[in-house]
Structure formats: structure tokens, C-alpha cells
Amino acid sequence: MNAEYGVGARLPAKTSLIVIRRRRGTSPQCWTHKSKESCMPTKETSNSRRGSAATKKNAFCSFCRKSYRDVGPLVEGPGDVYICAECIDLCQSILDQEQRRRGPSKSLFSDIPSPRSIVEHLDNYVIGQGSAKRVLAVAVHNHYKRLSNGADGSNGEVEIEKSNILLAGPTGSGKTLLARSLARMLNVPFAIGDATTLTEAGYVGEDVENLLLKLLHAADFDVEAAQRGILYIDEVDKIGSTNGNVSITRDVSGEGVQQSLLKMLEGTVANVPPQGGRKHPEQQYIQLDTSNILFICGGTFVGIEEIIRRRLGHRTLGFGEGANVRNEQTPGELVAQVQTEDILKFGLIPELVGRMPVISYLQPLDLEGLIQVLTEPKNSLVKQYQALFAMENCELEFTEEALHAIAKKAVDKGVGARGLRGIMEDVMLDIMYDLPEQEAGKVYTIDEAIVTGKQDLFKMPTTKSA
């Protein structure tokens, strides 16, 4: 209707917009729009006017069955069919969504970001992990350059295969944040799935196709957009056996799930259930080609240091004072030398590891790195709490000793950067409780004594004794 009619599309010739108004002491009057310029009552005979008034008086939307008294103006069509503005908006949104789903998607990139610019973007959100950032930047740049040069990634006679990525590292080192920051920069659909919830077909649990359903949700069911998105599969190390022993009972969430992931990672046309799970066998499946989806798998791989130590040789050779002495390397130094054979000995099958040729290990954050996480990123915890204080017209500052004490708590607990929020919430709980009652316009400073609980930021009011 045109904007003059307030609905958004052109009215058919036989369609009229009726507005039913009640004047004081009179019955409802029906007004009909015959043109843009005219908004006058239609000329009717007395008999037709009485019949029309009786009909219009009880007019209701033919879609939602609401009366004109509840929804306002109604659009009248042939055969006494009416529709309200709310239903028109709903129908328009449904048509727009269907058009986006069926229509051609927008081009992927006008200019593919260079690996250097990708690393610079990641530096704004993730502290440290320079080696992992470079590996990710090169792999992502080559992947989307492959897509922009052809849907099948081919250039003449040379077909460029995609390179999925495996990120290994301790909890709180930034694996998920790296993948999410990449998707934010590239403006592509991004979804996170958990490998521990997956089981083989026929067993209680989720199928591997449910991971693709999350990507479809992120793409608003735009199949073309989802087929070039990024899917991050977390806890992939949990679907492998760490010692290689064969269990007496069937492992329905281990090697069988790895076998199910093979074709999806390599590239296949998967049948995705739009309602998820196996509870709706009658549903129609959505076909999704995974050939151009970038898969990033992540896991902690706890204990892989000993596998690397055995491969490198944990005792020195020779005679004399230094013979048969354990070669003590830090876990960070060991995992920096991770190779494909170490991942295989950890429990992942060779076929799965072969489909993730890019392997990078993230180092655990030390004390200085955690302090940087608290202050430097754009959405750092310190900046978030400063914004909360600004909403109360106050300012918040942290001393270096306070930041050091917060970071040391995270190091002692071994929770990495992910545990910083929990520690900050514990430190700031009483402060945020009393903040709305404090004087505005003041500057409050958090020091080490407040972090350790030896001192309160606000002076508690003294209560009068009875």
C-alpha cells in the first residue's frame, strides 16, 4: 500500500480502507477511501446505508478475528473480508523473510581482509596468542579468497581445498573468543556447538546435523549465507579416548561421533532437521552444502603434555652426572611443539585429524596477560564496570595492586581469562549493592585491600541504637 494509506502497499481497485469512528450520541460511521485526495463518506441509499452500518458495526479482521475496536482501521476486500494493520505487517514480514530465503544472497566480500588486518582486529579483543592469531588469519584469508574466486573454490584446472582449523589450549585461553571475533569482523553467520552432546545415530542425544541447525538459526535460515559461515565445535577432545583402551561397553559419544563428523567437515550435502532432534520424523529437511563452511574445532586436550614429552624423549642420553635425568620442560614449552601424531595418540582418529590440517595451540595466560585482559580489550571487565559506575554519575578506578590481586586469584584457581568475570563479580558484589545510595559525582578507587576483603569501599552508615 502507498504511504498515504499507512499500510505499505497499493490497494486493489475493489479494496477499500474503512475507518469506523463513533461520534458522541451517534452510531458508528463508515468512511471509504476512494482516492488519495478524497476521504468523504460514500453516497448510499437509506436501505443500503442501514445494512452497511449494521455490517460495518460488527466488522472484524478475517485473519486474527479481532474487532475493529481492538485493532483500529480495517482494510476491506471483496466478499466482506477484512484485514487489520497488525496482520498486514505480519504478512509483509513473512513475505520478506521468504524472499530473502529464496532470493540470491549478497556477494561475500568486496575486499577480503588481509592476514595482517585480521590479526590487528583480533588484537582488539584477544590478548596474546600471537602465533595462533597468525595461523587463523592466514587460514581464514585463504578460505574466503577461495570462495570469492568461485563457489567451488576452483581456478581453472586447480581446485583449492578448504583448510579446517583445530585450536588446542587450556580453558580461558581465548579459543572461543578468537572464533567469535573472526566472525564479527567478516560479518558471516557464526554458531557454537558442543561435541559432548553428540551421539551416534540411533542413540539418545543430538545428531551432528544439529550443529548445522545452529548455523542456520544464526543465518536466519538463509541457506546461501549459512553455507559460507563459520561453525565452532567446542570440546572436540572429549569425543576421543585419552588412553586408547577399548571399553567393554559401546562408546556412543566417542569414535562413532568422530566418524559422523568426517563427511560434514570434508564437505557434503547434509539433511538438516529444521525443528531439531529426532522427535519430529515427519518434518521436511533442509539441504545444506558444507563444502564452503569453515569448521573450527577447539579443545583443552588435558594431558597432551606427557604425550609430547614421551615423543621428544623425557630422559637424556649418555654417561656421567647428567645421565638418566628427566628433561624438565614447562607445559607451555611442550605444547608449543604439538604435532599431528600427538593428537592421534590422544584419541582422535586419523581421518578426523586429516580433515583439520591447520593445528594451533594456545598458550595459557600468565599473570601479566590476565592483567592485560582486565584492562586492554574494547569490552574489558574494567571498562564494563566503569560504564556501570558512569550510569550512576560516578567514576571508578583500579590500582595496579588491585588488578594484580585479581589476576593472581585467577592464576591460583587455574581458570584462565574465563574465570576473571567470576572473581570480579565476587569483588564488586557489595560495592554494586551500595552504589545507588552513594553520592553522585565522586571518584571511587579499588585497591588491593578491597580486593582481598580487608577493607570496604563505602563507609557503612552507623545505625542508631534504641
Swiss-Prot record:
Transport is among the record's keywords: no
Residues binding Zn(2+), per UniProt: 61, 64, 84, 87
Binding site for ATP: 170-177
Keyword set, alphabetical order: ATP-binding, Chaperone, Metal-binding, Nucleotide-binding, Zinc
GO molecular function: ATP binding; ATP hydrolysis activity; ATP-dependent protein folding chaperone; protein dimerization activity; unfolded protein binding; zinc ion binding
GO term, biological process aspect, one: proteolysis involved in protein catabolic process
Subunit text: Component of the ClpX-ClpP complex. Forms a hexameric ring that, in the presence of ATP, binds to fourteen ClpP subunits assembled into a disk-like structure with a central cavity, resembling the structure of eukaryotic proteasomes.
Function: ATP-dependent specificity component of the Clp protease. It directs the protease to specific substrates. Can perform chaperone functions in the absence of ClpP.
Family to which this protein belongs: Belongs to the ClpX chaperone family.
The protein's name in its UniProt record: ATP-dependent Clp protease ATP-binding subunit ClpX
Organism in which the protein naturally occurs: Rhodopirellula baltica (strain DSM 10527 / NCIMB 13988 / SH1)
Higher taxonomy: Bacteria, Pseudomonadati, Planctomycetota, Planctomycetia, Pirellulales
